[in-house]
Amino acid sequence: MGRRRKSQAPAETPQITAFREAEKRYRPRTRTPTDYSDVLDLRDGAAAGVAAGAVRRAGPGAYELTDRPGLFVLPGVVAPDAQRRLAFCCYGAYHRPPAETNLTWLARRDGTAPPPRTAAPPANLRWATLGRHYNWTERTYACDHAEPMPRHVAELCDDLCGLIGVTMNAEAAIVNYYRPGDTMGGHVDDAETDRSLPLVSVSLGCSAVFLVGGATRDVAPTAVWLRSGDACIFTGEARSYYHGVPRILPDTCPPHLREATAWPDAPGPSNGDNSDEAYAAGRPPDDEALRGLCEFLRGSRLNLNVREVGD
């Protein structure tokens, strides 16, 4: 028989924070249905939220969470046409060179060949950066590694910020690609030099449960529904709030995105224009690409986050 080891003190159990408890509550479970009764719904229940004191009106179609000062939710603020344009650009252009993605970052780190150029997002694509590219190793924004921010993205951010009376210079952006079962753990966006500057976040595709807490994970977060066309703006102290996405709900994408026939400029089968220029202009290049996008959006979510770096 082997030598018996001396008994050791049991390892300390990791602390379960209030934020972690909320994440566990909303993440998919197989046996018990998820209770969404506490999720704040500002698309259909804004008036009730105002009456209950959960939010206050902060501008045309904008609401500030009462217990999360500086966080504004703008439900349904992005029009369907603008959603279509953004969705197609995220799907077909923003992950292509010279964009930085999790795949190009891994290839550079490991010294392997860069990923092949593809029309649709690869299945293992998780994020892509625009404008000033983010260095994930050093947690800094490169001054010498930047591309012009797409004009329609910058203009959208200007319009959204104007609704709550703030301004920003859109310098850097990240597109997050959520597929069924994907989540985003609680985190703080703290790489920017000046975190008093606004951060704009736009949701496209399937609905999500969004959690926003406080300056530590010990603060119990508020759960908010985010649907396609909703925007959030983080300002002031809200830039230091922990936030995350514990749940994406497949098959909740609105018809104006998921149905090819809902696209007003859907091309004929002879179009065949798959150029970057067509994607960047927001024009569906051809029937095949449009079908691919609609199929992707039926079960997925796109999240565009834009910020001013401030240095």
Per-region residue spans from a language model:
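Non-heme Fe(II) oxygenase metal-center motifs and adjacent flexible, charged/small-residue loops
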Residues: 1-311
